[in-house]
Amino acid sequence: MTYQALPDGLFIQNSPIAGQGIFTNKPLEVGTELGISHILDGKDMYRTPLGGFINHSDNPNCEKYRVNMKYYVKVIRSVDPMEELTLKYTFYRV
């Protein structure tokens, strides 16, 4: 298997929200798994490009969830092509 920084169809570009963000060039349906955003390793946490470039929104189209020592991102509402992917950030959690 070849490593991909972002899943097919996702790309990084300047964001109207802040700095740069992650966008899609294809429609994404509810429940689509986008991949790993963070990996826990003891006291350390490593961020992937997916976790590093996804911006905050109070009305996000994605959510993160934890399985063992990894955080994943999935789509929680339909996303149109060229729409930015967003999460609702929390202060004390990844």
Where do the model's predicted regions map?
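Conserved catalytic SET/PR domain of SAM-dependent protein methyltransferases, capturing the structural core
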Residues: 1-94
